Amino acid sequence: MSALPPSSSSPAVLALHSATHKDTILHKFDTLRRSELLCDITLIVEDVHFKAHKALLAASSEYFSALFTAEEQVSQSLYKLDGMTANTFSSVLEFMYSAVVLVDESSSEQLMEMARFLVIPDLIKAHEDLQAVDEHMQVKRKRGRPKKNQDLSQKENPESELQAQTSSEIQEVNEEPASPATDGSDGEFNPREERRREGKRKIKQPIRLKGFRMDDLMEGKEPGKRGRRRKYPDTEARCEECGKVFKSHLFLKIHQRTHTGEKPFRCSVCGKEFTQKHTLLVHQRMHTGEKPYICTVCSKALSTKHSLLEHMNLHTENKLFTCEECGKSFSQQRQLKSHNRVHTGKGLPECAECHHKFMDAAQLKKHLRTHTGEKPFTCEICGKCFTAKSTLQTHIRIHRGEKPYVCKVCDKTFSDPSARRRHEVSHTGKKTFSCSICKVSFARKDNLKAHIKTHNKENPPAQAESTDKPPQSAPEQQEQEQQQQQQTSGDKELHSILQLQPFQLPAHGEQEIQLLVTGENLSLDQEQSISIITSEDTEQSLALLTQPSGHVQNLAVVTPDGNAQIQTISVLGGEVNGGDPEQMHVITLSKEAMEQLQVHHGAPQQLQVIHQLSEEQTGPVAGIHISGQSGQAISISQTTEQIPSDQIQGQTFQIQAGTVSYLYTTSMNPQN
């Protein structure tokens, strides 16, 4: 370390300079890379993963610098580089981290092609310096002296050999190299031995570079064909057709294909033609199913980087695509294209079965499966099938317990973004969806649809006859409503029924259907209770889950013969009590569904708590009780047969996908 002499001015200013600092920093980066510490990017070449640091890659290569700076606010940590060999890329990475690399004579041409493609000026300059020294050594060689290496001038390509090194030190490839350790590094470090050990572990044998050369990539030449790079005249690369100016004549040649219609790259599977080779490679991923770009948030795989960047906007909620007509913004470009049809008047894709229109063809294709019954996506865990892949991915998150989507208001987590959006509406307090029959308002559209089904089940004959009979007068409608009210007051035991459909019933002794009831989703009058009505031989398959929420700690369970013998599991104080649990289906009654009940049962009040424990029960377990106070009991009916309409005297609710949350399917440990 040296210090420059101070100037005559006062106060004195010292300029401290270290000749070894840059080498020490570079060696430290190399040590961190080999230990896989602080690495923020993984590069995949021929299925070999290379850990690295973005900052050093961007500082060494203009290609990586442009790639990373184009990410804007999206930070991707996994990239796959096509058209390269793992062995050659390992040599390039070694030069970036140590400024020294040892390569075989046969692979130097591949190394220089990759250096030009990645735009690594120091590596290219090191090769040029080595060439100049070799030419000088050939001129000064004495006559009759035996040659140690092949004359470089006899090679077809003078860029056939590279010994990467610092600008101040040059070594010949064929001589035995000394230890390349820099200042501050371990003297026993040998890059050749390190690369050989790494190659035995995970890097494939070097093969000829195919489909990578720049002139191959741009001009459609046969890959692997050696020769000098084409020299274009030193003139401006301007298109004579449209006047556009390009950085090089290579890009100009590609652009001219848009005018000539030339498409030299053809897909061997479907025959589709393309103007550029990389576009063909992206297209071929549709046939192979390859999706190398992985979302770091939800692990969704995509085939192109552009698709990944658009997908990441869904997580960041950045709406970068704005309609020029109305100013509406969208997070994906395809959404904007679909929206533009509203202004252009272009027809939307329409279903031939139900004539429903969709924003794009992809949504229509997904919808058609609802008519054909096709469910091509199967869960490998439980075997359940789905019509859409996105639905399967959400379902798999349920198995894994993953909930990456967080509500910004209450921090509640969800497994899919649509559930979070529906939940966030509840914080606004707005109920924009109203029933046209009874004027009840809902915050969510799916709850309104479920509510409308209850009206359709109440009076289906009236709807069928409405098409044949003329509309009734006002007195006739009032008389019919009075008759319906008299019928609803006839049977109080089945005043309200929440019916579990037969396809949701488990097999005897194999699974349980659990109803999770908390103070957040249930509130009744003081003289009301909850009755669970089951069919024969199904009481052992039904279980109740309650949580300590102040006033919901006891539930009434009723069987058809009046015996309270249903297995009840109560969750109080974090403990689970009951028999050996099997695989369970937990169903949560939504708050909106309870609001529908409250419309017919009055304002919500505190539920009366009744404790009745047997002598054999110990611990904080809620007792099983048959309530005698249920003037208007809310009944949850579990049957294997459809209940006749004459026995349903009140509001009927169907527990289906739209009205309940199908939360989790797992094995429950009684000790947790």
Curated annotation (Swiss-Prot):
Its main location: nucleus. Residues 198-208 have a biased composition (Basic residues). Residues 160-171 have a biased composition (Polar residues). InterPro entries: BTB/POZ_dom, SKP1/BTB/POZ_sf, Znf_C2H2_sf, Znf_C2H2_type, ZnFinger_BTB_dom_contain. GO terms for biological process: negative regulation of transcription by RNA polymerase II; regulation of cytokine production; regulation of DNA-templated transcription; regulation of immune system process. The keyword Cell cycle does not apply. Gene3D superfamilies: Classic Zinc Finger, Potassium Channel Kv1.1, Chain A. Keywords: DNA-binding, Metal-binding, Nucleus, Repeat, Transcription, Transcription regulation, Zinc, Zinc-finger. Residues 476-487 have a biased composition (Low complexity). A zinc finger (C2H2-type) spans 237-259, 265-287, 293-315, 321-343, 349-371, 377-399, 405-427, 433-455. Residues 140-152, 223-235 bind DNA. Residues 136-208, 453-492 are annotated as: Disordered. Signal peptide: none annotated. Coiled coil: none annotated. Residues 148-158 have a biased composition (Basic and acidic residues). One of its GO terms (molecular function) is RNA polymerase II cis-regulatory region sequence-specific DNA binding. Pfam families: BTB, zf-C2H2. It is found in: Nucleus. Belongs to the krueppel C2H2-type zinc-finger protein family. May be involved in BMP2-induced transcription. PANTHER family: AGAP004733-PA, LOW QUALITY PROTEIN: ZINC FINGER PROTEIN 721-RELATED. This is Zinc finger and BTB domain-containing protein 24. It comes from Danio rerio (Zebrafish). The gene is zbtb24.
